[in-house]
Structure formats: C-alpha cells, structure tokens
C-alpha cells in the first residue's frame, strides 16, 4: 500500500499541476474589429453606418444645424489584451447638436465583428446597447456640472452578449464593456456626459474575463487515475482494519 500510495500521490499532484498550467491565462490577440450600428429606438431621420474618417457613424434627428448621433472608431488591430485587465476597445464619439424635439434616438445597438487569434470560434460578434438621454437644454439641467450652453446629454451602455464566449487553450473568455474613460483607463465611469453643441470623444474600455475552464482530456484522465487509486487505498485500509479487529 505504501508503494501504491507513492505512485498515486505524484500522479494526483502532476494532474493538478497540469490542469493549473493549462488554466494559466495568456494575452489574447485581436486581429480585426469592424463596427456596425443597428436597432435605433425612438426618433427619426436615421442614417446608419456612414464612414467618417476612422469612425463609423449613426446619425439621427431633424437638425437645426446638423444631426446628432454616435460614432465608433475601434482600436487599431492587431492588438493584445490581457485577461482581467481593462483595455481600450475604441473611441466613442457623440455628435451633440440641437435637433427638433421628438426626433432624438433613445437607444442604438453597436455590433463589433472581431477575429480572435487561436480562438474557437475565431470569429466573434459582440453586441452593446447605448442608451441616449438627449436633454431639453433648459435650466435647471438634469445632470450636474453641465456645460454652457446647457445642458449635457448622458450616454450609458448595456452588454448584450455576456453569455457568449470563445475558447483559447482550454480557457473560456467573455468580453464586456466596463466603462468610459478620459485618462487612458486609469479610472472608468458607467456614463458619458456629453457637452451640448459639440462633437465629444471618450475612450470606451472593456475587459476579458475567464469563464469556466475546459480541462484537456489527458489531464482529466490522469487526475481520475490518481483519485481512483486513492479510493482503492482507502478501501484496503478499511478491510485491513476490519480483519485486525
């Protein structure tokens, strides 16, 4: 029994170590990012997916001077993101122009078609919803610290594909927005207050999170062998104790 124990315990430790090694998260490389706007709610006069330099825009509203809207410019690819560390997904732009009441969007969807190196599946489509509160530009302003002229609009977001994951080296990952930032991601906040009467940019940050690990079959087999050996040893000890009694 001592000999078997000496053989089994190393097997268990080796299996555990192997699974631990397989579970070590590595940097993830994104090789393509293509944005698409869709699903606008409320308002009128939509123009979808207009190219504007590096930005892809959605515009809305009956303008007094120019339409309002949002634009997104994804981070240049290829780029690498480390799991559980905030990274810049791209820049969000708000065209905050005076438009006729009742013609503003209340929400729009942003789809991001990405290619993830060495992932299964490699091609991913992530979806995010942006909620837009276009204020009436009348004092008192709805949000504090509003600019002059009043009043700031507020943009928030929702992740729509939190249950979607891709797998690299036996580890499942999910991608989710975590906030807006103007300081390179040192701090993030869940909303973007956009100054009235201007074009305002802000960084949009996300995070890769490790989901349920998928151990490799060989690791599971080795661990199972070790556990089976321990059970056998335990049963033999129980039988020996019974005979001695």
Task: Describe the predicted segments one by one.
Residues 26-213:
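Mature extracellular "passenger" or substrate-interacting domains of secreted, surface-exposed proteins
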Residues 231-245:
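C-terminal membrane-anchoring or membrane-association module
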Residues 4-28, 203-229:
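Short, threonine-centered small-residue motifs that mark membrane-proximal processing/anchoring sites
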């Amino acid at each position: 029994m001592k000999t078997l124990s000496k053989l089994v315990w190393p097997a268990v430790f080796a299996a555990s170590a192997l699974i631990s090694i397989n579970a070590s998260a590595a940097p993830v490389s994104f090789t393509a990012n293509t944005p698409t706007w869709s699903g606008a709610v409320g308002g009128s006069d939509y123009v979808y997916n207009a190219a504007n330099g590096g930005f892809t825009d959605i515009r809305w509203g009956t303008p007094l001077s120019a339409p309002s809207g949002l634009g997104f410019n994804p981070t240049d690819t290829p780029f690498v993101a480390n799991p559980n560390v905030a990274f810049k997904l791209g820049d969000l732009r708000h065209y905050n122009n005076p438009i006729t009441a009742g013609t503003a969007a209340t929400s729009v969807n942003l789809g991001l078609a990405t290619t993830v190196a060495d992932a299964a599946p490699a091609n991913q489509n992530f979806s995010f919803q942006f909620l837009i509160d276009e204020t009436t530009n009348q004092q008192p302003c709805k949000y504090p610290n509003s600019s002059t002229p009043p009043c700031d609009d507020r943009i928030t977001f929702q992740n729509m594909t939190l249950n979607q994951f891709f797998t690299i080296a036996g580890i499942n990952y999910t991608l989710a927005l975590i906030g807006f930032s103007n300081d390179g991601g040192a701090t993030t906040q869940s909303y973007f207050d956009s100054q009235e009467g201007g074009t305002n940019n802000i960084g949009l940050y996300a995070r890769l999170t490790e989901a349920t690990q998928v151990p490799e079959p060989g690791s599971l087999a080795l661990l199972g062998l070790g556990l089976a050996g321990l059970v056998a040893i335990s049963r033999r000890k129980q039988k020996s104790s019974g005979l001695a009694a």
